[in-house]
Each structure stands twice: as structure tokens, then as C-alpha cells.
């Protein structure tokens, strides 16, 4: 039996709740001009059902319900370290990034977050691994073109299928639909590594809470599959360290690298520091670096 409720009159057919064995309430709400469908199981006699609200989408394959949270964490143990693609940075990190962990690259515009991520992606592809790159800020063609300046050639990697770049406008759909596409792509591509550029754009999916839930679910999916997950965040405040993630997920990230820019003597200098890297003996110093036509070079102290 289906019943249409009237807004502001939830008790219009209240007597049906007592008659039915199972009651499911579905609705559609609009937050920040982004529509989201959600359902909640109000009652289900004789069943230990989930009591939270769950987002769902209606697609060509019918209804897809995407639980945001899970009662049990089933993350795989971190694997061996893999190179960042930059030998000097590997030394700063204590040997590189650990496979299957989460990495946050945070910094102001122009600091080199995308460049650093693409250096890693290229190195991984050349090792024969697959990388999924989700971009919320520029098209695949634009990314490939812009990376030519620091000498990072991505086009051949895309042709071989080792690098898969997908671009979406955050506000084009709700967080649940973005999540559905991300999880589907993970199952289709089977990457060893994933990059999300940038998480600061995810707020445009409807709300900060929706962005947080999306990023948490993607992170959990990656850790369950043993996929290294890179999050890039654009810090817009004057204190980059204070705005590491902007969405409140930095505490669950395994490795945090902060990139900053300083104006010294009339010129702009860039520096990075590894704020934390679980399970590794990383450097605790600031390291100056330059973006050249050969990628990223760390300046010797």
C-alpha cells in the first residue's frame, strides 16, 4: 500500500501505522538547491532493521539505497610503503606513503596540491598500477593540459587505461548520487589508488554534513578494498594549518601533508611539512620546494 502525505500533516493517515507490519517513509528535500531523496524504516515487526535515514537514488537500474554508516569497521591493514614519485619527498615521509591508507594534501591555491598528486599518480601508473582520479574542479582535458607545465605527461597513461579521470560538477547532483557513481567506478576500474580533487568543493553537494558523509563513505570503501586514498583540500584561511581539512576529517586521515606559501623578500616561497604519518618515522621539519618543468624539487637545507 502506498500513501501520499501532505506537507505539514504527517498524521493524516496515522491509523495506517498501527495496521501495517512494515512502514517505510520516503521524502525528497532540497538543501542548497540540491535535491536529495531519503528513506527511513519507521517500523518493521519481527525484524532488527536499521533505524537511521538512508539516501537513495532512482536510476536506470531501479532504486539504489546507499547506507552512509556501518556498524562494523572492516578496514584492511596498511600495506608496504609506495613511492610518492619524488625521491626527496619519500625521504621526508620516512619511505613513502603506506599502501591502502588515507592521505590529505592541504594548502592554499597555487601551492602545488594537484601537481603533487599527479606526480604520485604518474609514478603509480608507470609501476603498472591503476589510479582513479575524481576531479570536482576541472575537466580531464584541462587537467592533462595544465600538468604539462610542470612536466607531468598524463595522456599516454590515460590511453593505456592505467589512469582514469572523471570530472563532475559538485552541485550537478546530490551527495548520494555522487557516492553511487564513486562506488560503482571503484568496482568497475579496480584501482590501487584514488585521488579526490578537491574535497573543499564537496560542500557544494548540498551541505557540509552531506560532504562529510560522502567523504567518510568513500574513505571507508577505499580502506575496505585496500586502496590508497588521496584527498586534496584548498585552505582559504590565512592559517593553512588551522584549516587542514575544512570539513573535520583530518583526525581520521593517516598522513597529512600541509603545503604553504610565504612572501619573502618580494618573492613567493613554498614549503611543506608532514603533520602526521601513522606508522612511519617522518620528518618534523618544514621543507622548501619548487615547482619546475621537471615536477617538484625539494630545496636542500
What residue ranges belong to the model's regions?
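Conserved nucleotide-binding/hydrolysis micro-motifs of P-loop NTPases
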Residues: 4-9, 29-32, 45-48, 60-63, ...
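Glycine-rich phosphate-binding loops of nucleotide-dependent enzymes
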Residues: 113, 135, 192, 196, ...
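Walker A/P-loop NTP-binding active-site region of P-loop NTPases
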Residues: 92-154
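Conserved ATPase-coupling elements of RecA-like P-loop NTPase cores
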Residues: 9-12, 203-212, 241-243
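Substrate-engagement module of ASCE P-loop NTPases
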Residues: 1-5, 210-237
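Flexible loop/N-cap segments at domain edges
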Residues: 84, 89-117, 161, 166-168, ...
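Conserved P-loop NTPase
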Residues: 29-83, 87, 180, 187-189, ...
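Conserved inter-motif catalytic segment of the P-loop NTP-binding fold
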Residues: 129-213
